[in-house]
């Protein structure tokens, strides 16, 4: 569900009139192809996942972990998230080409072939799992492999296309980096790790439902049964509010599990604003007024960033 759109490569980029023109064309094509492969990894999603990983590692360690371990997890986690996204693009190439939001991605524009995308995704997945297995531990590597397989084979290939609860069931994948980061440090999973996992898990519904509201017609055109596409406004509002409240409540459950006021106070404040924005959106939607769902979408990103920044700061103090 990346917001990234890509500019297609010109159909004449690789054609040549003469030897010199052909060489220049190929040289110009290389950056575009590299950019296309990078776009397949959905860098913005990778960035958001890493925002949750490092603070979880810091809390698990009780401070800043060894820099080499942080580097390994960041590289391995980035490759894993990128692999999952590339394979997602490969599986979803049929629906991406009919959605306005995604039709300029590399596969619909034929900038990258499906075969090459599949190979690229599998290579990234193999390297990421191997890296974590060699330099961290079996639990972190196993969680990474499980997250990739679940996201692509269970969520993308099956649940996304068949159930209105697709966002809920896919939420475990988005929250997995918290567990992976924690496991890389300790080799186990403590209650605090599961609490932070819960925050990210529940957060994804009030984060992604507004996106689906904005692109409702796009998802309908592709036949994807996102909740805002097929359910009533009342049902969508109820789920946004229930999961927004669960997100904030679980974030407070994490407070006594090794965190202090440096975490708790900012979390209370930003949580209150997050809930206010969720209620505003739902109130306007229920009245049939014009809504700006992306306001909650962006606010939810701010919320998660502040909460995990507070986790990191608390772990350092």
Curated annotation (Swiss-Prot):
Belongs to the UbiA prenyltransferase family. Protoheme IX farnesyltransferase subfamily. One of its GO terms (molecular function) is protoheme IX farnesyltransferase activity. It holds the Pfam family UbiA. The keyword Cell membrane applies. This is Protoheme IX farnesyltransferase. It comes from Salinispora arenicola (strain CNS-205). Converts heme B (protoheme IX) to heme O by substitution of the vinyl group on carbon 2 of heme B porphyrin ring with a hydroxyethyl farnesyl side group. Its EC number is 2.5.1.141. Residues 1-21 are annotated as: Disordered. The chain crosses the membrane at residues 45-65, 67-87, 116-136, 139-159, 182-202, 240-260, 262-282, 297-317. CDD domains: PT_UbiA_Cox10. Carbon 2 of the heme B porphyrin ring is defined according to the Fischer nomenclature. One of its GO terms (biological process) is heme O biosynthetic process. It catalyses: heme b + (2E,6E)-farnesyl diphosphate + H2O = Fe(II)-heme o + diphosphate. It is a multi-pass membrane protein. It comes from the Bacteria. Pathway: Porphyrin-containing compound metabolism; heme O biosynthesis; heme O from protoheme: step 1/1. GO terms for cellular component: plasma membrane. The gene is ctaB. It is found in: Cell membrane.
């Amino acid at each position: 569900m990346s917001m990234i759109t890509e500019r297609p490569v010109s159909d004449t980029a690789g054609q040549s009139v003469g030897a010199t023109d052909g060489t220049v064309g190929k040289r110009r094509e290389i950056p575009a192809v590299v950019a296309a492969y990078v776009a397949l990894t959905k860098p913005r999603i990778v960035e958001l996942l890493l925002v949750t990983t490092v603070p979880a590692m810091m809390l698990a360690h009780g401070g800043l972990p060894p820099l080499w371990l942080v580097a390994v997890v960041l590289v391995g986690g980035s490759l894993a998230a990128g692999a999952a996204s590339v394979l997602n693009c490969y599986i979803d190439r049929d629906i991406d080409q009919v959605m306005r939001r995604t039709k300029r991605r590399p596969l619909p524009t034929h900038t990258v072939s499906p075969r090459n995308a599949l190979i690229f995704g599998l290579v990234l997945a193999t390297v990421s799992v191997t890296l974590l297995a060699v330099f961290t531990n079996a639990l972190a590597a196993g969680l990474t492999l499980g997250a990739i397989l679940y996201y692509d084979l269970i969520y993308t290939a099956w649940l996304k296309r068949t159930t209105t609860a697709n966002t809920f069931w896919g939420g475990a994948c988005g929250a997995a980096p918290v567990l992976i980061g924690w496991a890389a440090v300790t080799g186990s999973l403590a209650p605090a790790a599961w609490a932070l996992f819960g925050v990210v898990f529940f957060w994804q519904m009030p984060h992604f439902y507004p996106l689906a509201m904005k692109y409702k017609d796009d998802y309908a055109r592709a036949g994807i049964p996102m909740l805002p596409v097929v359910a009533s406004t009342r049902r969508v509002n109820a789920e946004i509010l229930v999961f927004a409240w669960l997100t904030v409540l679980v974030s407070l459950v994490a407070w006594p599990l090794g965190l202090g006021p440096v975490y708790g106070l900012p979390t209370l404040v930003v949580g209150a604003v997050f809930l206010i924005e969720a209620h505003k959106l739902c109130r306007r939607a229920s009245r049939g007024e014009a809504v700006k769902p992306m306001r909650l979408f962006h606010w939810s990103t701010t919320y998660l960033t502040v909460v995990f920044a507070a986790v990191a700061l608390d772990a350092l103090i």
